Structure formats: structure tokens, C-alpha cells
């Protein structure tokens, strides 16, 4: 299998099973692995990705009227080169890091644009391509009260004058 070097881009992506906090799960009982899954709505693209070695899975339909859905798990690693994650809420962009990315687990996500980078692995002759988040732009839906009571930067307090050690009494 040829080495995959191209990034994947998903505009207006549908993400599922978010675990940005890295909480323990059935598949990661110890926890610490931050992941989410991205839907791949185009069956031809999903097959091409499988052929390249990406780990594309199929989610069985819940209802008989539904179709199976191709998807892929994406890892979120904050190492030497952390992903660029921008949260947009009420037009304000906030850069998220490993300390605050967990808020996306419960956020009402309006839209997501993703860039996923490949990691080609080879373990004892078995090969494949793991998906790692490179960049993500997440627009969050805010309710009208969140907008109304949105935190503004508080005015800075005056710093007390230097104390020379003498008490005023």
C-alpha cells in the first residue's frame, strides 16, 4: 500500500461521538484519548479512503428507512504540533487548547470545517492510516440568553500603590 501524504478536508462536516475531554469509554477504559468521528456521506469517497488504508467504518442504520453511514474516528493529539482549533460563538473566534477543548463535547454545534492529516503506521507488517486532527473551525449555536449575558471583559482593577511598610496609623 502506498504511503498517504495528502490531508483530508471536510467542509460543513457532521461529527459524531465527541470525546474531546478524553473521558474513559468502552473502547478506552483508562481514558485520556481525545477523539471524535466524522461522517463520510459520499460512498465513493469512503471506498477510496478504505483503498488508501484509512480506517473507515460503517454505522448500521437505526431504522429500516435509513441507509448505512460511513464514518471515521479522528484522534485529537496535543503534542509537538497541536491542532489549530477555533471556536466561533456569536462571531467571536476563540483558539481552544487541551485545557478547554472539552467544552465541545456538550456544545450545540452549528457547523464544522475540518482538516485531517494522515499518520501512516506499520506494526509487524500490518499497515494503515490513522486520522489526526490538523485544524477545526467550529461554529457554536448560542441561545438568546447566552448572547444577552455574554461575558464582556471586566474592567481592570486599580493596582494598590506600593506599600513602603509604614502603616497609616
Across the structure, where does each feature detected by a protein language model lie?
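OB-fold ssDNA-binding interfaces and closely related basic DNA-contact patches used
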Residues: 1-82
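Residue-level recognition of well-ordered beta-strand positions that form the cores
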Residues: 37-39, 115-117, 137
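Acidic, gly/ser/pro-rich intrinsically disordered tails
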Residues: 1-4, 142-169
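OB-fold/S1-family single-stranded nucleic acid-binding modules
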Residues: 123-144
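Exposed beta-sheet edge/beta-hairpin loop segments within beta-rich domains
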Residues: 91-112, 119-130
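A beta-strand/beta-hairpin structural motif
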Residues: 73-82, 87-101
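Beta-hairpin (beta-strand-turn-beta-strand) motif
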Residues: 41, 79, 117-121, 141
Amino acid at each position: 500500500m502506498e504511503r498517504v501524504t495528502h490531508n483530508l478536508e471536510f467542509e460543513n462536516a457532521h461529527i459524531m461521538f465527541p470525546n474531546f475531554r478524553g473521558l474513559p469509554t468502552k473502547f478506552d477504559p483508562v481514558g485520556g484519548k481525545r477523539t471524535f468521528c466524522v461522517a463520510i456521506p459520499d460512498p465513493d469517497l469512503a471506498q477510496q479512503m478504505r483503498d488508501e488504508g484509512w480506517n473507515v467504518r460503517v454505522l448500521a442504520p437505526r431504522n429500516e428507512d435509513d441507509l448505512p453511514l460511513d464514518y471515521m474516528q479522528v484522534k485529537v493529539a496535543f503534542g509537538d504540533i497541536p491542532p489549530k482549533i477555533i471556536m466561533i460563538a456569536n462571531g467571536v473566534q476563540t483558539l481552544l487548547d487541551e485545557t478547554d477543548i472539552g467544552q465541545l463535547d456538550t456544545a450545540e454545534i452549528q457547523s464544522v470545517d475540518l482538516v485531517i492529516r494522515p499518520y501512516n503506521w506499520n506494526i509487524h507488517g500490518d499497515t494503515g492510516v490513522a486520522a489526526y486532527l490538523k485544524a477545526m473551525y467550529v461554529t457554536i449555536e448560542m441561545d438568546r440568553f447566552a448572547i444577552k449575558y455574554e461575558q464582556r471583559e471586566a474592567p481592570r482593577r486599580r493596582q494598590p500603590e506600593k506599600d513602603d511598610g509604614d502603616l497609616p496609623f
